[in-house]
Amino acid sequence: MVSQLLFPLFPPFPALTGPAPSSTIETIKLPKNTGGHSPPSVLQRSLPRENKRIVVKIGTSTLAHPSGLLNIRRVEELCRVLSDLKNAGHEIILVSSGAIGMGAGKLALPHRPEDTPTTQAAAAVGQCELMYTYDKAFAEYNHTVAQILLTAADVDHPDRFQNFHNTMRRLLDLKALPIINENDTVATEEMGIGDNDTLAAVVAVSMEADLLILLSDIDGLYTADPHTHPEATLIAEIPALTREIWELAGGSGSSLGTGGMSTKLQAADICTQAGCDMVIANGSSPSVLYDIADGKPVGSRFRGKKG
């Protein structure tokens, strides 16, 4: 049954597996909240390689103006920087939110839709605009993009997830730049992955990425919510996700998106358990990706478990 393939959000303090086994494969069990009807999904990731493959996730609030319409200048800069990183030898995978927000803006909706039919209609309109913009922008630098839309069932079903993995590997072999989003046109709240922070972490682990970068409208993880506590300070290095770190997660995200700091910490938990580093950084200037790729201290870096 479809209800047994759900991929809901994690509890506030995810109980993932303990220390990695001594073999060359790390196994991560993603906890479910399905009432015990189905076993947790399992992802496998080889031990870390050289720092080459990078997954970049950009959120709706970073892609769009407050009106919901696409921030064309920012998208063009993002595509220029990612193209340059590819030219430098990095393998880039982009997880892009924005379909619903873009569609809401193009349809002149007064706010992000709340009912399912309007949400899915906005996603259908917005995904077209989003991919058209990406395709045109990356073509300026002679890079070919590929669209991949996923649902929770694709992630949970072993055969479908293996097909996704095989396709992704072939796309990277062909030097294409995969652009991934949740398939919001068919996904519902009950059947969806929930947010692209989680999706990006699943992609990063399954594709054996060396680094996941979450570009947001905030500089990183703070000692308190900087929107309401101006005295809050940025935490540059997080070696472990302690209970104190989890308690720093504030409320939900912006009015345009679905992800807040709690979803970013959940993404960090998935990545770090698998040995993959993750960085939260402000995406208002995509050129910050250069410094992050070079290992410079930008935003908040969560260190992956090694060994």
Briefly describe each language-model feature range.
Residues M1-V2, T188:
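Short intrinsically disordered, low-complexity coil segments enriched in acidic
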Residues F7, I25-N33, S38-T144, I148-G307:
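C-terminal catalytic "cap/lid" subdomain
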Residues F7-F13:
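Aromatic (phenylalanine/tyrosine) cluster motif
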